[in-house]
Amino acid sequence: MTYTPEKTLFALFAPNDAKKVTLRIYEEGLGGKALKTVNMKRTANEQWTATVKGDLMGKFYTFDMGQGECPGVFAKAVGVNGKRGAIINFSKTDPEGWAQDQHPVTKSPADLVIYEMHHRDFSINRPDAKYPGKFMALTEPWAISHLKELGVNAVHILPSYDYGSVDETRLSDNKYNWGYDPVNYNVPEGGYSTDP
């Protein structure tokens, strides 16, 4: 999905046996009827595209190949529970310097001291956590200090991507998951955000 205020381009990889791909635009990330339905065009082997004119900022989309709707495997933002892709302008949501960010470089993999961390467990019972169980907890001074005290130089956060077994509309149910049921690999898990 590539957004501009004038139009939004949608592209999808679909297997060769796909006969038809339908794009649906929604007002909400969950529930409600489609505002617009567009038949996508096959533009290359296994690639389908559609361009929708107008400003779709804040709307949601799905692709349907006849087996149910989904946001596609390359979605980077979704509505609650990952059922629909979110149409956003990433230049407005990415933090300052995001595009220039570079990962740390180590001379050898043998130099890595890796800490595998369950995101929720890391901060959920911390009395001084402002954002217990949330991604924002990692930005708090105590979190960085704790990781430095451990002597680690790499953190493997699990789960970080959007997974399916925790209903983000019912976070008070206190369900637990290591992320072995991925839904959207390129989307942060909504249950760890401050506004799923």
Write out the residue ranges for each language-model feature.
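Catalytic domains of carbohydrate-active enzymes, especially glycoside hydrolases
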Residues: 142-164
